[in-house]
């Protein structure tokens, strides 16, 4: 079984924020697979079972806040007895321009507290889909305010027309075992 875990914050006030872009991608993937999320308190997550590329997959959205994602990931891995090679994390990336998606199979947290939590609980050997959210607005607001601000209308449209399809294709590659660090995608133009 593969685990696809998206970082984000629980609560409707965060639903369309930059920090929840991973959740938005996972919600779209679940919808396309006909999967429904159910809260699993012992796993600290909402999970949904799906079949992708002919394989069983667990989609997971931690119900902890973004900066405590590692606790949920560890609980899920222990419960399902999966290795780090079976885990893909989808998250926003401040260092990449909006719409750029890059694959990484290990690495430091680069100041991302959610990744820091994951690395603390899991180590660094899991795959990551890093979805760029950077825009000039970041410089005026500061990082903390920027990641908690909703996507603009143009960004939300790009998410639906380009980022979600690209993310879905990369998830399918991960499940099929063909995802690698050169599977980088650039699907949108800056908005």
Task: List each model region and its residues.
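Nucleotide and nucleotide-moiety/phosphate-recognizing core
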Residues: 2-106, 116-129, 136-142, 157-190
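Hydrophobic alpha-helical segments within soluble ligand-binding/sensing domains
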Residues: 111-114
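Electrostatically charged, flexible surface regions
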Residues: 154
């Amino acid at each position: 079984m593969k685990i696809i875990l998206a970082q984000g914050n629980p609560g409707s006030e965060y639903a369309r924020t930059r920090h929840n872009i991973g959740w938005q991608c996972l919600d779209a993937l679940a919808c396309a697979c006909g999967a429904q999320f159910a809260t699993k308190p012992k796993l600290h997550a909402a999970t949904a079972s799906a079949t992708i590329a002919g394989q069983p997959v667990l989609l997971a959205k931690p119900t902890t806040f973004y900066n405590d994602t590692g606790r949920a990931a560890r609980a899920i891995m222990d419960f399902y007895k999966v290795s780090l090679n079976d885990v893909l994390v989808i998250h926003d990336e401040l260092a990449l321009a909006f719409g750029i998606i890059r694959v990484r199979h290990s690495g430091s947290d680069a100041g991302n507290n959610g990744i820091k939590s994951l690395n603390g609980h899991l180590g660094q050997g899991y795959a990551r889909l890093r979805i760029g959210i950077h825009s000039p607005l970041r410089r005026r607001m500061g990082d903390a305010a920027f990641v908690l601000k909703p996507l603009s209308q143009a960004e939300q449209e790009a998410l639906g027309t380009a980022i979600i399809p690209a993310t879905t294709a990369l998830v399918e590659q991960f499940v099929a075992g063909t995802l690698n660090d050169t599977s980088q995608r650039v699907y949108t133009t800056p908005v």
